[in-house]
């Protein structure tokens, strides 16, 4: 039996950062986020709902898309800086 030791497990902050990054710039649909971040539909919805509640993402109702807010961009900057300092 072969076990792939290259698999990197992501913590919650890493998943959040990847979601915010995928919705950075142009508004995107939930499916695009799901495929870019490699999450199930249910988990993607849970994370996106949390990010909207915390003000890190916004839902554009007329377009049915999501976009990273300024607060979300600030989270990304801080997260990336911490990653840079710890690796």
Indicate where each model-derived feature is located:
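Basic, amphipathic "hinge/linker" alpha-helix immediately C-terminal to the N-terminal HTH DNA-binding motif
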Residues: 64-77
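Amphipathic alpha-helical dimerization/coiled-coil segments
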Residues: 1-4, 81-87
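Short helix-to-turn junction characteristic of helix-turn-helix DNA-binding domains
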Residues: 19-23
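A short, conserved structural fragment
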Residues: 52-62
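Short amphipathic alpha-helical interaction segments
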Residues: 38-53
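Short acidic, hydrophobic short linear motifs in intrinsically disordered regions
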Residues: 27-37
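Short alpha-helical segments that sit at the start of domains
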Residues: 1-17, 43
């Amino acid at each position: 039996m072969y076990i792939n030791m290259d698999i990197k497990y992501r913590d919650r902050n890493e998943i959040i950062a990847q979601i915010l990054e995928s919705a950075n710039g142009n508004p995107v649909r939930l499916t695009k986020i799901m495929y870019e971040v490699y999450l199930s539909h249910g988990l993607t919805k849970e994370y996106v709902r949390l990010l909207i509640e915390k003000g890190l993402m916004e839902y554009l109702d007329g377009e049915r898309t999501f976009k990273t807010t300024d607060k979300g961009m600030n989270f990304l900057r801080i997260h990336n800086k911490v990653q840079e300092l710890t690796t």
